Amino acid sequence: MAMFSEKQYLDLYQSSSRMIKKHSAEVLNAVRDAAFEDFRRLGFPSRKVERYKYTDMSAIFEPDYGLNLNRLEIPVDPYQAFRCDVPNLSTSLYFVVNDAFYNKALPKVELPEGVIVDSLCKVAAENPEFIAKYYAKIAKTDEDGITALNTFLAQDGLLIYIPKNVKLDRTVQVINILRSDVDLMVNRRVLIVLEQGAEAKFLFCDHAADDKNFLATQVIEAYVGENASLDLYCLEETHYKNRRVSNVYIEQQANSRVNHNVITLHNGITRNRLDLVFKGEGAECFCNGCVIADKNQVVDNNTLIDHQVGHCTSNELYKYVLDGEARGAFAGRGWDRHGAQKTTAQETNQNLCATKTARMFTQPMLEIYADDVKCAHGSTVGQLNDAALFYMQQRGVSREEAKLLLQFAFINEVIDKMELEPLRDRLHHLVEKRFRGELNKCEGCKLCK
């Protein structure tokens, strides 16, 4: 199966590379052929590869999806038809339709001088040297077949640039819409650059506007300069036919701060990868994950926190609630390199299987090559406490309501760690509705009403 999956993408590029390049930018095209050769060599990672042991990637890419290589215009008016409201949260709102930045007939967003939120291709045409400095530099195509595939197929994307010492007062919200009349594969690319002392918060919301089979690959590269602060929230509310493979690469300089949060409320199969590297001392990161899955949904989170230098702090907390026949996986690796003294690293994965048929695979790991560190890791997998359920039923609470309350109390810890208060309040509401079976799609979307 894997060889067939790879062959269809190799054949696709060999027959359509001119078309792909025609509708993209020279900077993106400059690395395309090398990425293709890397994919030819690497292929899709098999389960024999440690970081992919829990999810069969070739099966995800096996179906024959359509691709919009000619960049045909997709009829959609996202601002009028699609809303993803977070009450009391004032955002600068942008849309990405499939894998293209949408800039038609949208209200103009006022941004501080020098801040850029725009099409990656557009900026690459205007300032190719700037894009070439960052594009495909930390997302290395010679190390991962999925990243290589995305790099030789991606034709556009989103650029977010925050200049030195600029602090954004408003959250930048990017709504990624999957829209198609046929089964479709999209390949998104996001480049985020925060210069020294910059501060910004980003909320990425993934939604599907049509009940089609979608495959979305996504590569995010984020450069966080010295003394800069990045808050990144990634929320997925799609449907059971959606396949999502997201690789996030973050590079932190000295005394920088990153708060990374991934929330999966509705999906089909989701595979999230986070690679974060400390390049300067005094940096810190907080990585949180909230997963709710039921039926046959699959959610696989894989993280690598690379302490290349000392005096850095990392904290990870991922929590899963699995119902039905859902399957979850978490593998986290904390890597404390030689000479990275005074490292503090905490990695925790806690999981609740609400049924006997739900399955969770967990593998927290630490590799420590320095002797003056404070590092700990742990994981738990359990079911609802029968004694607690009985206690609540004896006091007039129905079994279903008691189950809901215990699940909500369990997942609440990770939600409360999310610093964006309006989003946190919204998630409390959405998670409760999700547990009650009342939330089938994003309730803020006009298309879903």
Region spans (language model):
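N-terminal amphipathic, basic helical "cap/leader" segment at the start of enzyme domains
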Residues: A2-A148, L317, D323
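Conserved beta-strand/loop scaffold segments within soluble protein domains that form the structured core
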Residues: K108-D118, E126-V397, I411, I415-K449
